[in-house]
Amino acid sequence: TSQVSTIAVARAGSKGTIYTVSGTVTLISSGSVDIQDDTDGICLRPVDTAGIERGKKITAYGTWDEYNNLLQLNNTIILKIEDGTLPTARETLISEITETLESQLIRVSGAKVTNVDGTTVTISQDEGATTTIYKCPEKENLTVGDTITVTAVVSQFKANYQLLVNSAEDIS
């Protein structure tokens, strides 16, 4: 657990293997955080998020696992929290959202809202490709037909990729 691996190396690992990784926090969710380095992104859980903020750099170790097809490090222990810089969101088309972007910060511009169902908002772009914004905090302000830009972290639930936003400010 002492040698720090790149996140790409950890993601290429195998179930049950312990990895130590270091990356910048891009998403804080209930009991988990997503981090990203220059090579890739990964979800860490469960995590006590006290003292953790977006943009902070953390070093942690955990056990490689998948939950509903989301690759993550489980039973995570945070070793260090230090100042960092939030990475620039990668401009992405919905049709480009795949496993290679999982747990990374992206930006989707010019997406049309096609459905609002509780806190799940479906958006479409580029010839009909769709995805959902899960637990969308700004749902009451969004209506079908709106054109929006979303800055979010790519997540996965079973066969579906979804976008997770930190706050309403991530949608414009």
Task: Please describe what each predicted stretch is.
Residues 1-172:
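OB-fold single-stranded nucleic acid-binding module
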